Regions:
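Divalent metal-coordination and catalytic microenvironments
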Residues: 1, 9, 35, 74, ...
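N-terminal cationic-hydrophobic initiation segments that often serve targeting/anchoring roles
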Residues: 1, 26-30, 66, 148-149, ...
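Mid-to-C-terminal alpha-helical segments outside catalytic/metal-binding sites
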Residues: 1-8, 206, 210, 221-298
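An N-terminally biased module of ancient metal coordination in phosphate/nucleic-acid-related enzymes
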Residues: 1-28, 296
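Active-site gating/metal-coordination segments in enzymes
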Residues: 16-124
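Well-ordered, non-membrane alpha-helical segments in soluble/globular domains
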Residues: 19-20, 54-60, 96-100, 137-144, ...
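Acidic/histidine-rich helix-loop elements
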Residues: 45-50, 86-90, 128-133, 223-246
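Catalytic pocket-lining loop regions of alpha/beta-barrel enzymes
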Residues: 88-213, 218-220, 224
Length: 298
């Protein structure tokens, strides 16, 4: 953060990170971090005991966490049955949206945003309902049309804006479609190369007010380089190569991509922090640091 001039970070639960650890980081560094809640202990309980997973029980854990006042949102993604892949049980859109409704209700209760995961890193196999990382909605951003209509007062943020890794942009296009057609859907952009910013910034139904810069974990997603091609650089894991052992400088790469944009500084400031501060209701030292996005003249 000091290296790149980042004032504050929103912590999500990564591998081996826990809610308790994130809360401790927040407490130990006043004004530097806020944290999102993730259903971690119930998931571990299901894996340990073999009991049937339930969305209601997972939502109860999120409710208890948010009730502490230590968290500002829900993420990364929504809780899901950790044994889904092992069971080889298919789950359809209607069943999964019914599960997600439990988490959306908790978000509505506490007036916090949710994060909807879209994308995969390519280096390890995961499926719609197969494999250890089975996650049905991660391949289906268009489902958010229904969520946004059913829960118009809950802000939904697309993790990775449809591009977690690789050069493919199909899910990115679908995420743009949803964001442009709804008022409560936003896009996180940390793994976008520069050209991906062009369409949403030009779209009057998206614009800078719906984009949030952030990064993925970075510890094992290298940057690929293909000179003369589009994109010239992108993040991606290689399937036949072991995970890298150093800290990939994803932060520097990501900031370089957004730094190439020749847009008004106020718009850039919204993407780099103003939108996150607004959605997560983060207290700022001054009240007029960023444009007021509800003012169409701004």
């Amino acid at each position: 953060m000091d290296c790149y001039g980042v004032d504050m970070c929103i912590l999500t639960s990564a591998f081996n990170m826990t809610n308790d650890l994130n809360v401790q980081i927040v407490k130990n560094n006043p004004g530097k971090f806020v944290a999102l809640a993730y259903g971690e202990k119930y998931r571990q309980q299901v894996q340990r005991t073999g009991e049937d997973w339930s969305a209601a029980a997972a939502a109860k854990e999120l409710d208890d966490l948010l009730a502490t006042g230590h968290f500002v949102g829900i993420g990364e993604g929504f809780p899901q049955d950790p044994t889904l892949g092992a069971k080889h049980r298919r789950i359809d859109i209607h069943s999964r949206l019914d599960e997600i409704a439990h988490f959306m209700a908790v978000a509505r209760k506490y007036k916090v945003p949710v994060r909807y995961h879209v994308g995969l890193t390519m280096g390890y196999t995961t499926g719609f309902c197969r494999g250890s990382g089975a996650n049905p909605e991660t391949y289906n951003p268009m489902w958010v049309h229904d969520l946004a209509i059913e829960w118009p007062d809950v802000q939904i943020i697309f993790e990775h804006g449809g591009v977690q890794a690789w050069w493919w942009d199909k899910w990115y296009e679908e995420c743009l479609n949803v964001a442009a057609a709804t008022d409560n859907v936003y896009l996180e952009t940390g793994t976008w190369w520069t050209e991906l910013y062009d369409k949403p910034l030009r779209d009057p139904n998206i614009g800078a007010k719906k984009l949030l810069w952030g990064t993925d974990w970075g510890s094992s997603i290298p940057v690929e380089w293909q000179p003369g091609q589009k994109p010239e650089t992108y993040v991606c894991q290689r399937r036949k190569t072991p995970p890298v052992r150093h800290q990939v400088d994803m932060f520097g790469w990501s900031l370089k991509q957004i730094g190439r944009l020749n847009i008004p500084q106020d718009d850039l400031n919204l993407i780099l922090g103003g939108n996150a501060a607004r959605l997560y209701r983060i207290k700022l030292p001054l009240t007029r640091l960023f444009p007021f996005v509800d003012d169409e003249s701004s």
